[in-house]
Amino acid sequence: AVMGDPAHASVFAFGLVAFGFLCMGPVTIAVDSYGPVTDNAQSVFELAQTEHIPGIKEEIKRDFGFDPDFERGKHFLESNDSAGNTFKATAKPVLIGTAVVGATTMIFSIILLLEKAGLLHLSLTDAPVLLGFICGGAVIYWFSGASMQAVTTGAYRAVEFIKKNMDLTKKEADIGDSITVVRICTEYAQAGMWNIFIALMTITLAFAFFDPNFFVAYLISIAVFGLFQAIFMANAGGSWDNAKKYVEVDLKQKGTPLHEATV
Protein backbone atom coordinates (compact mmCIF):
# COMPACT_ATOMS: atom_id res chain seq x y z
CA ALA A 1 0.00 0.00 0.00
CA VAL A 2 2.85 2.35 0.80
CA MET A 3 4.71 1.69 -2.45
CA GLY A 4 1.49 2.16 -4.47
CA ASP A 5 0.82 5.60 -3.04
CA PRO A 6 1.98 8.37 -5.44
CA ALA A 7 2.91 10.50 -2.43
CA HIS A 8 5.73 8.09 -1.68
CA ALA A 9 7.19 8.03 -5.19
CA SER A 10 10.12 10.21 -4.09
CA VAL A 11 11.23 7.57 -1.59
CA PHE A 12 11.10 4.93 -4.31
CA ALA A 13 13.15 7.23 -6.58
CA PHE A 14 15.69 7.62 -3.79
CA GLY A 15 15.90 3.84 -3.64
CA LEU A 16 16.66 3.77 -7.36
CA VAL A 17 19.47 6.27 -6.75
CA ALA A 18 20.89 3.91 -4.12
CA PHE A 19 20.63 1.05 -6.61
CA GLY A 20 22.51 3.13 -9.20
CA PHE A 21 25.25 3.87 -6.67
CA LEU A 22 25.56 0.16 -5.90
CA CYS A 23 25.86 -0.66 -9.61
CA MET A 24 28.91 1.62 -9.73
CA GLY A 25 30.47 -0.34 -6.87
CA PRO A 26 32.83 -2.52 -8.94
CA VAL A 27 34.21 0.51 -10.80
CA THR A 28 34.66 2.46 -7.57
CA ILE A 29 36.40 -0.45 -5.85
CA ALA A 30 38.69 -0.89 -8.86
CA VAL A 31 39.69 2.79 -8.67
CA ASP A 32 40.12 2.55 -4.89
CA SER A 33 42.37 -0.53 -5.20
CA TYR A 34 44.95 1.46 -7.18
CA GLY A 35 46.12 3.06 -3.94
CA PRO A 36 47.08 -0.15 -2.06
CA VAL A 37 48.76 -1.57 -5.18
CA THR A 38 51.04 1.46 -5.57
CA ASP A 39 51.70 1.53 -1.82
CA ASN A 40 52.75 -2.12 -1.84
CA ALA A 41 54.94 -1.61 -4.92
CA GLN A 42 56.84 1.16 -3.15
CA SER A 43 57.14 -0.93 0.02
CA VAL A 44 58.42 -3.99 -1.87
CA PHE A 45 61.08 -1.89 -3.60
CA GLU A 46 62.19 -0.32 -0.31
CA LEU A 47 62.31 -3.59 1.64
CA ALA A 48 63.96 -5.59 -1.15
CA GLN A 49 66.99 -3.24 -1.14
CA THR A 50 67.83 -4.31 -4.66
CA GLU A 51 70.35 -1.51 -5.11
CA HIS A 52 72.57 -3.05 -2.38
CA ILE A 53 72.91 -6.44 -4.09
CA PRO A 54 76.52 -6.87 -5.32
CA GLY A 55 76.81 -6.61 -9.11
CA ILE A 56 73.11 -5.91 -9.62
CA LYS A 57 73.67 -2.95 -11.95
CA GLU A 58 75.88 -4.99 -14.26
CA GLU A 59 73.38 -7.85 -14.22
CA ILE A 60 70.47 -5.57 -15.13
CA LYS A 61 72.56 -3.96 -17.88
CA ARG A 62 73.41 -7.39 -19.28
CA ASP A 63 69.91 -8.86 -19.12
CA PHE A 64 67.76 -5.85 -19.99
CA GLY A 65 70.08 -3.50 -21.85
CA PHE A 66 69.83 -0.32 -19.77
CA ASP A 67 71.61 1.30 -16.84
CA PRO A 68 69.36 1.25 -13.75
CA ASP A 69 68.82 4.47 -11.80
CA PHE A 70 67.51 3.32 -8.44
CA GLU A 71 67.08 6.81 -7.01
CA ARG A 72 64.99 7.87 -9.98
CA GLY A 73 62.95 4.67 -9.75
CA LYS A 74 62.33 5.29 -6.06
CA HIS A 75 61.19 8.83 -6.88
CA PHE A 76 58.70 7.51 -9.44
CA LEU A 77 57.37 4.91 -7.00
CA GLU A 78 56.92 7.54 -4.28
CA SER A 79 55.11 9.82 -6.74
CA ASN A 80 52.93 6.91 -7.84
CA ASP A 81 52.13 6.17 -4.20
CA SER A 82 51.05 9.78 -3.77
CA ALA A 83 48.78 9.46 -6.80
CA GLY A 84 47.34 6.29 -5.27
CA ASN A 85 46.44 8.20 -2.11
CA THR A 86 44.61 10.75 -4.25
CA PHE A 87 42.77 7.95 -6.06
CA LYS A 88 41.64 6.51 -2.73
CA ALA A 89 40.49 9.89 -1.43
CA THR A 90 38.52 10.41 -4.65
CA ALA A 91 36.84 7.00 -4.69
CA LYS A 92 35.91 6.71 -1.01
CA PRO A 93 33.29 9.51 -1.03
CA VAL A 94 31.41 7.56 -3.72
CA LEU A 95 31.27 4.50 -1.47
CA ILE A 96 30.31 6.72 1.46
CA GLY A 97 27.56 8.28 -0.64
CA THR A 98 26.27 4.80 -1.47
CA ALA A 99 25.91 3.99 2.23
CA VAL A 100 24.27 7.35 3.02
CA VAL A 101 21.75 7.11 0.16
CA GLY A 102 20.81 3.57 1.19
CA ALA A 103 20.47 4.61 4.84
CA THR A 104 18.38 7.65 3.88
CA THR A 105 16.01 5.45 1.88
CA MET A 106 15.60 3.15 4.88
CA ILE A 107 15.05 6.07 7.28
CA PHE A 108 12.35 7.69 5.14
CA SER A 109 10.65 4.32 4.71
CA ILE A 110 10.54 3.95 8.50
CA ILE A 111 9.18 7.49 8.80
CA LEU A 112 6.38 6.78 6.31
CA LEU A 113 5.41 3.55 8.06
CA LEU A 114 5.35 5.18 11.51
CA GLU A 115 3.36 8.15 10.21
CA LYS A 116 0.84 5.78 8.63
CA ALA A 117 0.45 4.08 12.01
CA GLY A 118 0.04 7.45 13.74
CA LEU A 119 3.08 6.93 15.98
CA LEU A 120 5.32 9.71 14.69
CA HIS A 121 5.36 13.46 15.26
CA LEU A 122 8.74 15.02 14.47
CA SER A 123 9.29 18.50 15.88
CA LEU A 124 12.52 20.17 16.95
CA THR A 125 10.75 21.55 20.02
CA ASP A 126 10.12 18.04 21.37
CA ALA A 127 12.66 16.80 23.91
CA PRO A 128 12.88 13.22 22.52
CA VAL A 129 13.72 14.55 19.04
CA LEU A 130 16.48 16.84 20.33
CA LEU A 131 17.86 14.05 22.50
CA GLY A 132 17.84 11.70 19.50
CA PHE A 133 19.85 14.17 17.41
CA ILE A 134 22.41 14.57 20.22
CA CYS A 135 22.74 10.81 20.79
CA GLY A 136 23.17 10.12 17.07
CA GLY A 137 26.02 12.60 16.77
CA ALA A 138 27.63 11.29 19.95
CA VAL A 139 27.52 7.69 18.71
CA ILE A 140 29.26 8.66 15.44
CA TYR A 141 32.20 10.30 17.21
CA TRP A 142 32.37 7.50 19.77
CA PHE A 143 32.50 4.97 16.93
CA SER A 144 35.30 6.91 15.19
CA GLY A 145 37.37 7.16 18.35
CA ALA A 146 36.82 3.53 19.35
CA SER A 147 37.79 2.30 15.87
CA MET A 148 41.05 4.26 15.91
CA GLN A 149 41.75 3.07 19.46
CA ALA A 150 41.29 -0.57 18.43
CA VAL A 151 43.81 -0.23 15.61
CA THR A 152 46.23 1.87 17.68
CA THR A 153 46.26 -0.68 20.51
CA GLY A 154 47.25 -3.44 18.10
CA ALA A 155 49.98 -1.26 16.62
CA TYR A 156 51.49 -0.52 20.05
CA ARG A 157 51.43 -4.21 20.99
CA ALA A 158 53.18 -5.06 17.71
CA VAL A 159 55.88 -2.45 18.39
CA GLU A 160 56.42 -3.86 21.89
CA PHE A 161 56.86 -7.36 20.44
CA ILE A 162 59.33 -6.10 17.84
CA LYS A 163 61.42 -4.30 20.47
CA LYS A 164 61.58 -7.36 22.74
CA ASN A 165 61.99 -10.21 20.26
CA MET A 166 63.27 -9.03 16.89
CA ASP A 167 66.93 -8.67 15.97
CA LEU A 168 66.98 -5.63 13.70
CA THR A 169 70.60 -6.29 12.70
CA LYS A 170 69.59 -9.31 10.60
CA LYS A 171 69.86 -8.91 6.86
CA GLU A 172 66.77 -11.05 6.25
CA ALA A 173 63.45 -10.92 8.06
CA ASP A 174 62.42 -13.82 10.28
CA ILE A 175 59.24 -15.33 8.83
CA GLY A 176 58.02 -16.59 12.21
CA ASP A 177 58.38 -13.17 13.85
CA SER A 178 56.70 -11.50 10.88
CA ILE A 179 53.72 -13.87 11.16
CA THR A 180 53.48 -13.12 14.88
CA VAL A 181 53.38 -9.36 14.24
CA VAL A 182 50.61 -9.79 11.67
CA ARG A 183 48.69 -12.01 14.09
CA ILE A 184 48.98 -9.46 16.91
CA CYS A 185 47.69 -6.61 14.73
CA THR A 186 44.84 -8.73 13.34
CA GLU A 187 43.68 -10.08 16.71
CA TYR A 188 43.59 -6.69 18.41
CA ALA A 189 41.84 -5.02 15.46
CA GLN A 190 39.22 -7.78 15.16
CA ALA A 191 38.60 -7.91 18.91
CA GLY A 192 38.21 -4.14 19.08
CA MET A 193 35.85 -3.96 16.10
CA TRP A 194 33.76 -6.89 17.40
CA ASN A 195 33.29 -5.13 20.75
CA ILE A 196 32.31 -1.94 18.93
CA PHE A 197 29.78 -3.84 16.78
CA ILE A 198 28.15 -5.47 19.83
CA ALA A 199 27.92 -2.13 21.66
CA LEU A 200 26.53 -0.30 18.63
CA MET A 201 23.90 -2.95 17.88
CA THR A 202 22.84 -3.09 21.53
CA ILE A 203 22.47 0.69 21.73
CA THR A 204 20.50 0.90 18.49
CA LEU A 205 18.11 -1.93 19.45
CA ALA A 206 17.55 -0.35 22.87
CA PHE A 207 16.79 3.03 21.29
CA ALA A 208 14.29 1.40 18.91
CA PHE A 209 12.12 0.44 21.91
CA PHE A 210 12.50 3.79 23.67
CA ASP A 211 10.42 6.22 21.60
CA PRO A 212 9.58 6.41 17.86
CA ASN A 213 10.37 10.13 17.59
CA PHE A 214 13.64 9.68 19.46
CA PHE A 215 14.66 6.69 17.33
CA VAL A 216 13.95 8.40 13.98
CA ALA A 217 15.86 11.52 15.08
CA TYR A 218 18.71 9.26 16.18
CA LEU A 219 18.86 7.60 12.75
CA ILE A 220 18.73 10.93 10.90
CA SER A 221 21.54 12.30 13.08
CA ILE A 222 23.70 9.24 12.41
CA ALA A 223 23.22 9.65 8.64
CA VAL A 224 24.08 13.38 8.67
CA PHE A 225 26.98 13.30 11.12
CA GLY A 226 28.28 10.04 9.66
CA LEU A 227 28.40 11.50 6.14
CA PHE A 228 30.57 14.47 7.08
CA GLN A 229 32.75 12.52 9.51
CA ALA A 230 33.41 9.77 6.94
CA ILE A 231 34.34 12.23 4.18
CA PHE A 232 36.56 14.18 6.58
CA MET A 233 38.44 11.07 7.74
CA ALA A 234 38.79 9.67 4.21
CA ASN A 235 40.29 12.89 2.87
CA ALA A 236 42.39 13.63 5.96
CA GLY A 237 44.26 10.32 5.71
CA GLY A 238 45.25 10.88 2.09
CA SER A 239 46.23 14.49 2.77
CA TRP A 240 48.50 13.54 5.67
CA ASP A 241 50.15 10.76 3.69
CA ASN A 242 50.70 13.02 0.69
CA ALA A 243 52.21 15.70 2.94
CA LYS A 244 54.76 13.13 4.11
CA LYS A 245 55.45 12.10 0.51
CA TYR A 246 55.97 15.74 -0.49
CA VAL A 247 58.59 16.20 2.24
CA GLU A 248 60.36 12.95 1.31
CA VAL A 249 60.28 13.19 -2.49
CA ASP A 250 60.02 16.83 -3.54
CA LEU A 251 61.75 18.56 -0.64
CA LYS A 252 64.16 15.65 -0.03
CA GLN A 253 64.16 16.29 3.73
CA LYS A 254 63.77 12.74 4.99
CA GLY A 255 65.10 12.39 8.55
CA THR A 256 64.61 16.08 9.40
CA PRO A 257 62.32 17.47 12.14
CA LEU A 258 59.86 18.47 9.39
CA HIS A 259 59.74 14.86 8.19
CA GLU A 260 59.24 13.61 11.75
CA ALA A 261 56.32 16.01 12.17
CA THR A 262 54.62 14.78 8.99
CA VAL A 263 55.17 11.16 10.00
Predicted ranges, named:
Residues A1-V263:
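Hydrophobic packing and interface segments
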